[in-house]
Amino acid sequence: MKHSKKIAALIILLLMCAVLINPERYLSSVKDGVILFWAAVLPALFPFFFFTRMLTGLGFPETIGKFFEKPIKFLFHTPPISAYIFFMSVLSGYPIGAKLISEFYKNGVINTEESKKIIAFSSTSAPLFVIGTLGVFMLDNVSYGVIILFSHYLSAIITGLVFCNVRRLNATKSDVKPRVKPLPDNVIGDSINDSVLSVLSVGGLIAIFSLVIDVLYDLKFFDLFGNYSPLAVGFFEMTRGAKEIIKNPPSTGALLAALTGFTSFGGLCIFLQATTFLKEAKVRSSYYFLVKVFQGLVGAGIAYLVSLPLP
């Protein structure tokens, strides 16, 4: 067994022991994660999983791809269909971009190299979360939500420009324009089945991370980071990290930078959600992690600069 696998096995055993020692506490943590998934994530995510699956089968990605073919090739050197993946990611949020990449890879529309480039700019949060949850609900300031959203999407584009051009020499060229495979006769039924399985995998990770974070809190793990503990929490789960930093907010610039960093990186929970799909396109987790760290840092920097004129 490799050293990293031994560490992972040890962590899993410790988590199991924690549940056995205090089952009431940690089963409640899992329950909280399930409730969060059921009440907030499932209603927001399932329709988009379903509709994107339907649009794919109806040939809509090709229509969008043809319309944006020249700018998408000029900026990112990726196939036209990546425009559809980008717009769906912007509209629907995590982890739609990764899921669509997985689907198109399995259909033979894109290859692994193209998947790596597309995920660099197609891994984003949804406006509903940024403006609604962060801006209105948590910060009680829509303009702050707009700054975070602008910085977040700009960081995705910059990340795409950097990583796509770095990988440009590895791009594969083909004169054949692949087509999306049509869905079978039972379009609605198959779309629902696929969407249910995908969204349940997301729900499972949310429930597990609710448990993990509560265990880490009880072990005083986050106290090791002192004043930077909200950043450590946000590394694991962006929403809880946002709640922690808003409790004792720093300067406006630092606050918006941190929240944009959380949103752009996505947290380890969302990272693992995306990798469950990206592994089917043979995109390595280490590469995707580098992409998200870069995007998080760029997003934080942009938000800080934009917020400098603010009091």
Predicted features and spans:
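Alpha-helical transmembrane segments in multi-pass membrane proteins
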Residues: 39, 44, 48, 52, ...
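Membrane-core helix-loop-helix motifs of multi-pass transport proteins
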Residues: 104, 109-165, 277-301
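Final/C-terminal transmembrane alpha-helix of multipass membrane proteins
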Residues: 11-18, 289-307
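Intrinsically disordered, low-complexity non-transmembrane regions of multi-pass membrane transporters
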Residues: 1, 168-193
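Transmembrane helical segments that form the transport core of multi-pass membrane transport proteins
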Residues: 188, 192-263
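Structural signal for alpha-helical transmembrane segments and their membrane-water exit/capping regions
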Residues: 7-26, 49-59, 164-166, 210-222, ...
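Core transmembrane alpha-helical segments of multi-pass membrane transporters/permeases
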Residues: 8-12, 33-57, 187-215
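Alpha-helical membrane segments and immediately flanking helix-loop junctions
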Residues: 75-139, 232-249, 255-278
